[in-house]
Amino acid sequence: RRIKEELGLLIGVQTPPHRDLKRYDHLKEIGVNRVSFCFEIFNRELFEEICPGKHAEYGLDFYLEAIRYCAALTGTGRSDEPWVTNGEIIAGLEPPGSSIRAIDWITSVGAIPTVCVFRPLVGTDLQDHEPPKTEDMIPVFKHLYESCMEKGLPIGLAPNIHVSLVMLPEECRGFSQKRYL
């Protein structure tokens, strides 16, 4: 909290789900503003295949339970402290329709999706996996923006976040023909 007060920063934490979900209440109490869970893949079979460590240690259901729990903390506690929950997926590791279903689930519980774009890296298990085609990603990005807007989720609150592989909902505005107030 002292760092926040002195520097005026928002504090975010990316974490695997903890077995004691009440720990997230504590993170909020000490001034954390954003908690993010990178479960990568919404398709259960692909999650088990591509994320064997996450599958063995936590399982997809526990990631989703943690996201749901943390999203429900929005609106509790200090009103002057923003609290946002993110569910992070990696588009291009599963069919676009599965990524869109992930976005729908994440926004349905009041969390904000973060969509990373898969890029194969030399020396990794997925180095030979083809990167997604741009035309396959456009509907995912369009849906990311529209789903957040239709659910009235707070996007664009954290200034100066620029990550080359991540599309934030507000950055996807240009893919949509819909205009929101």
What are these regions (language model features)?
Residues 10, 14, 18-19, 53, ...:
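Conserved strand-turn element in the central/C-terminal portion of the radical SAM core barrel
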Residues 1-66, 86, 114:
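Core AdoMet radical
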Residues 75-82, 96, 100-181:
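Auxiliary Fe-S-binding modules of radical SAM enzymes
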Residues 1, 24, 63-71, 99-104, ...:
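Generic structural signal for well-ordered alpha-helices
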